[in-house]
Curated annotation (Swiss-Prot):
Protein name listed in UniProt: Transcriptional regulator of the unfolded protein response hacA
GO cellular component: nucleus
Disulfide bridge positions per record: none
Residues forming coiled coils: none
PROSITE patterns linked to this entry: BZIP (PS50217), BZIP_BASIC (PS00036)
One record GO biological process: endoplasmic reticulum unfolded protein response
Locations listed in the record: Nucleus
Keywords for the protein's UniProt record, in alphabetical order: Activator, DNA-binding, Nucleus, Transcription, Transcription regulation, Unfolded protein response, Virulence
Main location: nucleus
Ranges for domain bZIP: 80-143
Keyword Membrane found: no
Pfam families (UniProt xref): bZIP_2
GO molecular function, one term: DNA binding
Length: 342
């Protein structure tokens, strides 16, 4: 060994430098490379055979033993019994699971059908509502256009409407208007609206009887007759159906007391008052006041006279209500006791 080493050294020292080969190192040679390890797969010679799946509905053998449920199986027959019981339990559980899944699928199918029908119905309703909405929008636009045209168009001049008493400007005062009281109409209701049987002629007659006593004029109609109160002339006819009398004026009173005079009536009676010289010795008891009052108990026939409308009581009053009570004097009595009968 030592001899070989010495010979190599001598040979190297004896050779020239030019004869020695140049050693070069590439970068690829300096890189580290992992050694390739080949993994050898160990194949086990003893492999278990694959478990063969038994077909569905295979008849199971009848167990030879009758092992209680909670007892451990020890023998091969007992283990076979446990296997058969396990297979039966699995078959029952699988059947129950399949039935449950079938019911769930049927329920889902029914719900799907119902949802499809409801979706179809809602789509139809949506189309109907859209059509209705479009129709209403068109109608609204048409009405808006009509209202706008009616506002822009000027009204045609027509016949002037009659002024209504309830719509006159005098009844509704506007802001900033000063309305005097004399311009506001205050209608006075007629007295015939409150009394259904009271006539204007009877009202005027009753007022004239109390204010101007009747004067008996002899020789006109006969002895003891009184001058008619409303004898205003021979050309005036009293119609019961159209008896609308006005209050008597001074000229009417002049014609009343001077009815037989064709010339201008004498106003001395009105100016000087009633003359008591026409009576015998100025006795008022001799004046026939009873002839001027109708004491007839029969009611006055008011047929043909239009009653007042809108009043509940339309029965005429009887003249018997004007008769004095039993024991009262029928002659004129005053507070001074002028009449003899008082």
């Amino acid at each position: 060994m030592e001899d070989n080493f010495a010979s190599v050294v001598e040979s190297l020292s004896g050779t020239s430098a030019s004869a020695l080969p140049l050693l070069t190192v590439s970068p690829a040679d300096t890189s580290l490379k992992a050694p390739e390890t080949k993994v050898q797969e160990t194949k086990t010679e003893e492999k278990k055979p694959p478990k063969k799946r038994k077909s569905w509905g295979q008849e199971l053998p009848i167990p030879k033993t009758n092992l209680p449920p909670r007892k451990r199986a020890k023998t091969e027959d007992e283990k076979e019994q446990r296997r058969i019981e396990r297979v039966l339990r699995n078959r029952a559980a699988a059947q129950t699971s399949r039935e449950r899944k079938r019911l769930e699928m049927e329920k889902l199918e029914n719900e799907k059908i119902q949802m499809e029908q409801q979706n179809q119905f809602l789509l139809q309703r949506l189309s109907q509502m859209e059509a209705e909405n479009n129709r209403l929008s068109q109608q609204l636009a048409q009405l808006t256009a009509e209202v706008r045209n009616s506002r822009n168009s000027t009204p045609k001049p027509g016949s002037p409407a009659t002024a209504s008493p309830t719509l006159t400007p005098t009844l509704f005062k506007q802001e900033g208007d000063e309305l005097p009281l004399e311009r506001i109409p205050f209608p006075t209701p007629s007295i015939t609206d409150y009394s259904p049987t009271l006539k204007p002629s009877s009202l005027a007659e009753s007022s004239d009887v109390t204010q101007h006593p009747a004067v008996s004029v002899g020789g006109l109609e006969g002895p003891g007759s009184a001058l008619p109160l409303f004898d205003l002339g021979s050309g005036v006819e009293h119609d019961a159906a159209n008896d609308i009398a006005a209050p008597l004026s001074d000229d009417d009173f002049h014609r009343l007391f001077n009815g037989d005079s064709s010339t201008e009536p004498d106003s001395s009676v009105i100016e000087d008052g009633f003359s008591f010289d026409i009576l015998d010795s100025g006795d008022l008891s001799a004046f026939p006041f009873d002839s001027m009052v109708n004491f007839d108990s029969e009611p006055v026939a008011l047929e043909g006279i239009e009653p007042a409308h809108g009043l509940p009581n339309e029965t005429p009053y009887q003249t018997s209500g004007l008769q004095p009570s039993l024991g009262a004097s029928t002659s004129r009595c005053d507070g001074q006791g002028i009449a003899a009968g008082c």
